[in-house]
Amino acid sequence: MQIFGVDIGGSGIKGAPVDLDKGDLAQERHKVLTPHPATPDAVADGVKQVVDHFGWSGPVGVTFPGVVTDGATIRTAANVDDGWIDTDARALLGERLGGLPVTVLNDADAAGVAEMHFGAGRGRTGTVILLTFGTGIGSALFVDGVLVPNTELGHLELDGHDAEKRASSKVREDHDMTWEHWAAHRVSKYLAHVEMLFSPELFIIGGGVSRKAHKFLPHIEGIKAEIVPAQLQNNAGIVGAAMRVAEH
């Protein structure tokens, strides 16, 4: 079975039909740049461009970088325009897509669902935390395979700031940090804080940096939990968005 998944990020909006039997993209994904400002109408236009690229006419799952309740309503919008707050994203996107059924969920939760079913978390019990490092830091918390939604651990305080302002991939790029310095001094400190709070058995590191895991994972220090890269890499959000549609 195929369902369409769209992943809205701080820098790009990407999507593709997903083969839910294999947990992989059925076609090469299509990406457009996230508009700035990333207002609801502008982002909805971007989602429509991605869906229209494939001529898709069925249900669509969409991820969003913030807290999402009831599969529809946006409650926070850290890396997009504040106009999203309290927006019914399901209604907005459904209207923009000509009435197609739409389901919306947090972006990291979507990636986590995909990794737990098809990727690095498959078959794992206990406490598992997926963290996506990109424009910000997203999180998905699982206890014995069950998702605790909308944890948003990128907004924990670290050195007096939101953690994602200290340890995201964007921070590494903006400050021209080496992979080693970023891992040893920023990511390690952040993971230690999360580990103190939740004592997970496993950290899964996702987002775009998962493709470069060999450059930074060996330099993460002082963490008791196992740390592995996401297997679905940066397609996990698209796959998880499609999976959520199939659950409803």
Name what the model sees in each region.
Residues 77-80, 106, 234:
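Asparagine-centered polar/low-complexity signal
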Residues 73-86:
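A charged helix-plus-loop insertion that forms the helical arch/lid used to bind
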Residues 107, 134, 241:
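Active-site glycine-centered loops adjacent to acidic/histidine catalytic or metal-binding residues
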Residues 137-139:
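Basic- and aromatic-lined ligand-binding clefts that recognize polyanionic substrates
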Residues 1-59, 68-73, 93-102, 114-130, ...:
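ATP-binding/phosphotransfer module of carbohydrate and carboxylate kinases, centering on a glycine-rich
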Residues 109-113:
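Short acidic loop-to-helix transition motifs that present clustered carboxylates
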Residues 85-100, 108:
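Anion-binding (especially nucleotide phosphate/pyrophosphate-binding) glycine-rich loop
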